[in-house]
Amino acid sequence: PTCTWTSRASWRNSSLPTMNNNSSSTRLPIPQYVMTLAHAAALRSEDPYRKVGAAALDADNRVIGTAYNGLYPGFKAQDTFWASREERQKYMLHAEINLCSLFRRGEAKVVACTTMPCTSCMQALCAHGVKTIYYCEPYDKSEAPAIASLYGVELIQVTDYPLSRHFPLVLDS
């Protein structure tokens, strides 16, 4: 499934949880804010078919960093590299792992990922002390829900946020 964004007014007038006490505020709620950052980061991925982004906030909801899936920095792949998903997949660095390289254990409290973290990435996020993880697209092969439950990490799907409709992250082919 792809993420959807229906209209600008939908988040303003929605019953989505907010991080402030002003219910009449038009301020973007934290889940949608951090997911929008993750989505924007995903647009930097060089993978022409699958773009994944991640963003981290500290305990005060300040941005720690953003990251995306991609190849080792400086590596220039030939066009034929992208032809086979199976072949290229083993070389791709996941957005969550790239993100974890930007902060120390316990520094990030909230992480948003455009796709539910795979099992290994979920383990890494838990090991880094992340307490809340937002994601848009589910990933059926991941054990993330079980890992989150075991470690007391909130794993919450967020599909209604700016950018999701206008800039798709999964392209056909």
What does each of the following model-derived ranges do?
Residues 3-173:
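Zinc-dependent deaminase catalytic domain
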